[in-house]
Amino acid sequence: MSDIDQWIETLKNGENLKETDVKILCNKAKDILNNEDNVIRVEAPVTICGDIHGQFYDLMELFKVGGDVPETNYLFLGDFVDRGYNSVETFLLLLALKVRYPDQITLIRGNHESRQITQVYGFYDECLRKYSTLNVWKYCTEVFDYLALAAVVNDNIFCVHGGLSPYIKTIDEIRIINRKQEVPHEGVMCDLMWSDPDEIEGWSQSARGAGFVFGADVVKEFNRRNGISLICRAHQLAMEGFKLMFDNSLVTVWSAPNYCYRCGNVASILELDENLKKYYKLFEAAPTDRAQNSKKVIADYFL
């Protein structure tokens, strides 16, 4: 068995990798991610997943429902870490799968794949607690800078963590951003990870303090101009697992059931077949969530 296969087995068992192995894994992942474009072209069939937020045992449920890699192709929309108790295992397993099966799993960046955010919402503290050093946090946050910003499925479905930006009109404009940096406090890269849709016209400031809020007219014009039929995003809790808006021109997919171990929501994944027919698969939290054994304060859920 190769090192990477051994690491995958170790992580699937909920065990931590050695610090030296984390460094090797993160370096391998950076080499692969470095060769990917800002906007990744993905071919259906593919299964799209929203926020995971360190809920490792629920990620295991997700794979039970959706199928294992490489039999199923996956596109994850970011926010792998923070909030949940097992961000280390969650992120490293997804990275290991990416290294082992680079064409079967696509990872894009969420607003929590950020040094600043992880220092507040759990990942930083978890790394320190599990490894008694910040090295693992540093290795992982270096990988964050290499993650793609968006994906397009079959030139028809635009996938992003948060939403749109008033500073761009076309997907091609995303392709020329310098993404290999900490998430900025403003600008296109920030907006892609922080913005939200709402029942408004045009644009407005976001209560999150980053990104914007955008309405149906913005979505329909963006979709028309770019020749796409749907924006698929995550970033906001959907109590029913997913939420369609604006005459089905935008969908939010949420993949962290019983978010923060208290919200009571179901989760979903969106399966697209080769003809882009959509199947929303719902799932609930893992029956025995060992992650809850460690007690800690969880910040409010709206970031």
Curated annotation (Swiss-Prot):
One family name in Pfam for this protein: Metallophos
UniProt keyword Manganese present: yes
Cofactor remark from the record: Binds 2 manganese ions per subunit.
Top enzyme category: hydrolase
Active site as annotated: H112
UniProt GO BP: double-strand break repair via homologous recombination
Binding site for Mn(2+) 2: D79, N111, H161, H235
One term under GO cellular component: cytoplasm
A molecular function GO annotation: protein serine/threonine phosphatase activity
Listed SMART domains: PP2Ac
Enzyme Commission code: 3.1.3.16
Catalytic activity: O-phospho-L-seryl-[protein] + H2O = L-seryl-[protein] + phosphate; O-phospho-L-threonyl-[protein] + H2O = L-threonyl-[protein] + phosphate
Cofactor: Mn(2+)
InterPro entries on file: Calcineurin-like_PHP_ApaH, Metallo-depent_PP-like, PPA2-like, Ser/Thr-sp_prot-phosphatase
Keyword Transmembrane tagged: no
Binding site for Mn(2+) 1: D51, H53, D79
CDD domains for this protein: MPP_PP2A_PP4_PP6
Signal peptide boundaries: none
Keyword vocabulary terms for this entry: Hydrolase, Manganese, Metal-binding, Protein phosphatase
Similarity remark: Belongs to the PPP phosphatase family. PP-4 (PP-X) subfamily.
Protein name: Serine/threonine-protein phosphatase PP-X homolog 1
Organism ancestry: Eukaryota, Sar, Alveolata, Ciliophora, Intramacronucleata
